[in-house]
Amino acid sequence: MALNPLEQFKVYTIIELPKLFGYDINFTNSSLFMMISVILMVLFLLLGIRKGAVIPGYLQAAVEYVYDFVVSIIESNTGSKGLEHIPLIFTVFIFILSCNLVGVLPYSFTVTSHVIVTFALSMVVFTYITIVGFKERGVEFLRILLPKGTPSWLAPIIIIIKLFAYLVRPISLSIRLAANMIAGHTIIKVIAGFVINMNIFFTPAPFLFIIALIGFEVFVAVLQAYIFTILTCVYLSDAVK
């Protein structure tokens, strides 16, 4: 990996399975680390809420903080109407966060570095919001394509532009998340490879610099989960307001 920083993003088969309708459904390293991320996510939540103490311990306090954090994002962008959608938004946030943080660990695989994964997440969010929009507002949901006060002669152009902008939302969401995770991990690998090749790994400055980069990557992992969630809430506000 030190020689090729992009090698860490390669998907390889762990268990080969029979094809399903002509499609490969092999169990890959991506599948493995996605399962690990989900298991860690579920354990974190279950262990945090199993006692439900009035005076919470550290783990329960952490779970409550994450939950309250997501609720505050929803309320600030959608108001009280968006609170009924907490299950989806909280699940998306904690899943992305878990995948991102697992990807920082040595010899792991960053699931969210692949557009196919982030695009699948984005399409779930996009489809859900579109369904909610028509369910809550009916045909009036289409008003998001034409801002109030738009001159009639300009309306056709604006509608086309707004429709295009709406349809590319899942693409922009998925590429933003994947690109940032790829960039961060690649930089760490490049610098770490340089330090190892120069045989200066155990000298203080380069070692501390790599530690700082890893700390920064943890920050980016949390930040990207936050950005994905807040954009989801912004898009949801169009459907419920």
UniProtKB/Swiss-Prot annotation:
Q: Where are the transmembrane segments?
A: 29-49, 54-74, 86-106, 114-134, 153-173, 177-197, 200-220, 221-241
**CDD domains in UniProt:** ATP-synt_Fo_a_6
* InterPro entries tied to this protein: ATP_synth_F0_asu, ATP_synth_F0_asu_AS, ATP_synth_F0_asu_bact/mt, F0_ATP_A_sf
Which parts form a coiled-coil structure per UniProt? none
Question: Do you know which Gene3D superfamilies this protein is assigned to?
Answer: ATP synthase, F0 complex, subunit A
Cell membrane in keyword set: yes
- Ion transport: present as a keyword of the record? yes
GO CC annotations on file: plasma membrane; proton-transporting ATP synthase complex
Q: Which UniProt keywords apply?
A: ATP synthesis, Cell membrane, CF(0), Hydrogen ion transport, Ion transport, Membrane, Transmembrane, Transmembrane helix, Transport
Role: Key component of the proton channel; it plays a direct role in the translocation of protons across the membrane.
Q: Cite the PANTHER family for this sequence.
A: ATP SYNTHASE SUBUNIT A
Family note = Belongs to the ATPase A chain family.
Q: How does it assemble?
A: F-type ATPases have 2 components, CF(1) - the catalytic core - and CF(0) - the membrane proton channel. CF(1) has five subunits: alpha(3), beta(3), gamma(1), delta(1), epsilon(1). CF(0) has three main subunits: a(1), b(2) and c(9-12). The alpha and beta chains form an alternating ring which encloses part of the gamma chain. CF(1) is attached to CF(0) by a central stalk formed by the gamma and epsilon chains, while a peripheral stalk is formed by the delta and b chains.
What name goes with this protein?
ATP synthase subunit a
Q: Which organism is this entry from? A: Wolbachia pipientis subsp. Culex pipiens (strain wPip)
